[in-house]
C-alpha cells in the first residue's frame, strides 16, 4: 500500500514543479489577436508590401497588400482609440494570404466599451475586380464580437483565428495558435511583416469605410 501511495503522489509532485505561477503583470496584461487566413480563387495574389490607412482618432482602418483590401471598424460613434494597434501581412505559397490584426496591451475587456469590442470586417480582392458576391462569417464571445463579409467570387476560403486573453492564459493554453489551412504558426510568424502607415487621406478613408458600412447594413447578401 505504501508503494502505491508513492506512485500516486509522484505525478502530482512533478506537475506542481513544472507549472509556474502566473505573475500579477501577466494576469493584468490582456491582448487581442485576429488572424485572417485567405485563399484566393482563380487567381494568384501578387506578393507585395502592405500598407495601413487610418485616422489618428477613429475606430477603423484599411489595409492593402498581397492581393486584398481589408476594411475593419468598430461600432463607436465618438472619437476614441481604435482597439487594433498593429497590422501584419504575408503571402504564403501561391494562393494563401495571412493578415494579422493585434493589440497586445488592450486592458481588461470589461474596461473597454462594448462598441470598441464589436468589429465589422470587409474583405475585397484588390488585384481582381470580382463579381462582388459576398458571404458572411461571425464569431462572438462575451469579450468580443467579429462579423466578416468577404467577396466569395474571388476568395475560395476565409478562416479566422481570434484570441482575447491575458498573458497568463496565453502562456499556458494550447489552443492559442495561428494557422492557415495546413500552414502552421511557426511558418506564419516567420514571414509576417508589419504594414506601413500611409499618409492619411480622409476622402479615401471615408469612401471605403462608408462602402463597408453599407455592405454590413444589408440583411441579405
Swiss-Prot record:
Induction: Expressed in the intermediate phase of the viral replicative cycle. Belongs to the orthopoxvirus OPG195 protein family. This is Protein OPG195. It comes from the Viruses. Pfam families: Pox_T4_C (PF04490), Pox_T4_N (PF04491). Transmembrane segments: none annotated. It comes from Monkeypox virus.
